[in-house]
Amino acid sequence: MTNNKKLYLYKLSSKAMNYSMDKNERNVLYLNKYLHEYNNKGTKLQNSNMMNSWNNQLYKFNKNEVINTLLTDKLVSKLLVKLFVIKEMGINNPSYLQGSQMGRRIFINRPKFKHTINTVYINFNYNDTNMKMINNKHTLYYGSLIKDINNILGCFNYKNHNNELFNIATYLSGLYNKKVMIMPNKMKYNYNDNVIFNSSISYDLDKYKGGLAGKTYSKLLRDNIPMNNSLSIKNNYMTNIINNNNIKYNNMISNNSLNIKDIYKSFDINKITNELLVNKYLIGLSMLFKGKNIKKAGVSRSIKEKLLFGSLSNKLYRKNSGLLVYKNNNNTTKYLNFDININKKYKLNYMPNHHAISQLSKVNKAKTGVYGISVKLNTI
């Protein structure tokens, strides 16, 4: 039963569905393709047999089983991507959509798999193209479509848990011989995920003249991507540290017999401000376009364009940022150095950089060749 399901996954992930090839031959062809890919990495599988890779977390047991699990994960990943990449959502309801709305698309990041003894967790991010709704009917249609996709996948619900009806989650449970929990995360903005952001840039480039560095598209990026004020981040960070220290201090002086657990009893996860959450603020981003020009056919020379917004380093505070400057009555400038160690006290220059890098290469949209896009996001 499991082998039949795995062969069916190979069939779904096949790109040669229209070829006049026998079903079994096509399955064997793609099975050999994936096996050849892993065999090229060496017999010891240093690149595959890992405890915690970025997209697959699984425990080490048998080498052959690890290979089979990774192959199955890759096939399931292709299946989920095919389900979510919907290029023309209004094809069955043309009265709801007009013009450019016919090209509405859902972008999905590569699913991440976490294997435990009894459960397989599948987590991925997705985002739809940012287009205006025409009317309420379109809004209802889009909402019902996402609901239908969730029902088909059997997505995990924290209230009702998994839908017990036959869906992809139950189908994959029979394939893995474990319970499968699918948990999609809808991104509010495309720049919340570097892979989705990269895909959306490639999707939009051919709509604007001038390419990545053109006035129209670069202005659109600057207007839609927030670059938060580093000074406000510093002040919020310091204020939260001071408030938390005051809570601990008040608990200690109110009762000297308190244990270490009682000192922190006032901290509630629901009360902790979200200003301290990692990856909340987008500090800067860098985009690199390299390859053939999309708009100009017949140009053989490759071009290279790079955009930089904000900063890719979180060391935003200079050495003397803690100094207080004021002027006397005689209009002379003086410095108060009582606050000179503010960076050392609150470790403002020790915030780690969170770089998310995504590369999209060999895109065949250019008439004269291919191009590649690299996106780097820095968050704090």
Swiss-Prot record:
Where is the protein found, in the record's own terms?
Mitochondrion
Query: One GO cellular component from the entry?
Result: mitochondrion
Q: Does the keyword Ribonucleoprotein apply?
A: yes
Q: Which residues cross the membrane?
A: none
UniProtKB keywords? Mitochondrion, Ribonucleoprotein, Ribosomal protein
Q: What does this protein do?
A: Essential for mitochondrial protein synthesis and required for the maturation of small ribosomal subunits.
Assigned protein family: Belongs to the universal ribosomal protein uS3 family.
Name of this chain's protein: Small ribosomal subunit protein uS3m
**Source organism phylogeny:** Eukaryota, Fungi, Dikarya, Ascomycota, Saccharomycotina
- The primary gene name is VAR1
